Amino acid sequence: VEIPVAESLGVSRTPVRLAFRALEQEGLLEKAGKRGYVVRRFSEADVRSAIEVRGTLEGLAARHLAERGMTDAVRETLAGCIAEGAAVLAKGFLVDEDIGRWGRLNKRFHDALVDAQDSRVIADAIARNNHLPFASADSLALDRAALPSEYQKLRIAQLQHQLVFDALTQRESARVE
């Protein structure tokens, strides 16, 4: 596997081998005996677990942030994301462009929360987990054919963002977690 990849990229086997090892450590590739690597299969349960792990780690990050307190810049970023989310939902329905917009604002919200807390260990664990399929905050599994029901999901997510922001503002660490 290394040789064809190296040839197609015009590089030696060494960087390809190192990249494959890194992808294996991230859980995206698995060793296939002496034949190299195969792409790891992920079940629906794996995806659910990865999302649950992200939620738990982000809850811990939010607790740390609530205990320490938010800077004005973090407060403004989170409030801006909430305002943008409200604007997306204000018309009472979704269009295709709203999905990408929501994904970007959701990523900004979650990234701001994680970046502002004080634990590099938590941030690193979240970053590793985010490499798994559909685990990151910008991975939205929305059904474009059922936008009315997806609208309701985003309304709930918007409410959750508001509740997290309120708890952070009031420095209620147990509530935010």
Name these PLM-found stretches.
Residues E44-R48, A66-D72, G92-E97, R144-K153:
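A ubiquitous short alpha-helical element
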